[in-house]
Amino acid sequence: MKHQYFLIIALLFLFSGLSQSGKVMDQLTLDSKILKGKRKFAVYLPPDYDTSSRSYPVLYLLHGYTDDQTGWIQFGEVHHITDKAINNGKATPMIIIMPDANTGQPGYTNALSGKWKYEDFFFEELMPHVEKRFRIKRNKRFRAISGLSMGGGGSFLYALHRPDLFSSAAPLSASIGPQTVEEMKIFSYVDYWGYKKSNYNKTDYERFNKLNNPLNLVNQADLKALNSVRWYIDCGDDDYLYKNNILMHLKMREKGVNHEFRIRDGGHSWTYWRTALPSVLEFISQKFH
């Protein structure tokens, strides 16, 4: 009986060691000169971060419209899902950065008006800040980007604008921007596409698309640069954004861009994105190793 007791204790210690937990902080801030104020962001640190001195790969994980830096934590269960993927050996230990792109005005683009430059903030202030503040490996091979909906569009945008910075990009249920002038007007009241303006015209539409529409950016980009990024595109068959994601798949295939494309059962929901995240973590980890 005594031997059985010690065996049980030993097994408990063993399994507790195998199921280590990472750490999440969701109210971190940095001062932004570009956006003129404090900006919030969240971070996931892997289980062994506090007990090691090593540096880690990084995933920039972007939230969707109406959410903020806490979205992936509160609704996406990023902490639990990433812990499980790391402990199961499906994902390499990594740091995940989740910035707020809702405060002030929503979106990941630079506004057409020039008054709000979120993309500049992301590359010129956020990335240098977090990669200095945390033990992050600062080169393309160990940097990935993903996001859902508006954040899926943002991950397309950033990897297409700066393929030199990311080894992998995994847009989920991506919103890739307005396909008509009328669509631009739908979100004009929240400045979603650039700046508050109720009478968007063809010139605005063409200007926005040239700068920010992934369908156009694929055409403009160098094929070798695009293929230096590993692409993973995922959208539900009941998602209202499925058409544009299929168009991106077809455009990339036509251009000769290597990519993985998934249409799975599901809609535009956290249930869908929670089931997508493990595959994203496994996919980007293939390059991190």
What are these regions (language model features)?
Residues 20-289:
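Non-catalytic cap/lid and distal C-terminal segments of serine-dependent acyl enzymes
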Residues 1-6:
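Positively charged n-region of N-terminal signal peptides that target proteins for export
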Residues 10-19:
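Hydrophobic h-region of N-terminal signal peptides that target proteins for export
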Residues 8-10, 45:
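A periodicity- and composition-biased signal for non-globular, repetitive helical segments
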